[in-house]
Amino acid sequence: GLGDVYKRQIKSELTNPKLAWMFENCFPNTLDTTVRYRKTDGKDDTVVYTGDIHAMWLRDSGAQVWPYVQLANQDPELKAMLAGVIRRQFKCINIDPYANAFLDPYDPNPDHQWMRDMTDMKEGLHERKWEIDSLCYPLRLAYHYWKTTGDISIFDEEWLCLLYTSPSPRD
């Protein structure tokens, strides 16, 4: 599976058996429980749920996959999943740069509990509670993914659109 070589390496370096067991079970947890990878229009597209809530927070999804960036060049599936997270984050920001959480567009039963919020809720949003880290985490992930892999394919039309839709000091 994803990151198996890395897991074995780290586990072999840990002398405490409980800590080794915890790492082996915790490290792949995001991949096993919250990642929803697919191809959309021939491009990698990954939604990362935040725990038990079937929605994707920009900050949390970036933090959840962050430990895997260092392994992207060792595993093509992991690299594709990460590229998909970045593309999905860019798409989300383009839906609404002031939102912080988004619904999975392929979820047949999305959770619309916040649609009555007194904000400009749009289709595809889970929550519209803007925080600056909602924009910082996707940029951090994209930058470090690019620096690690050299892959510029993530900087496509969604990226260009994001540059023009993101909040500016004039807003």
Q: Model-found features: residue ranges?
A:
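Low-complexity, Ser/Thr/Pro/Gly-enriched N-terminal "stalk/linker" regions
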Residues: 4-59, 84
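Short, small-residue-biased leader/transition segments that mark boundaries at the very start
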Residues: 1-6, 167-171
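Aromatic-rich carbohydrate-recognition surfaces in CAZymes
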Residues: 54-82, 86-166, 170
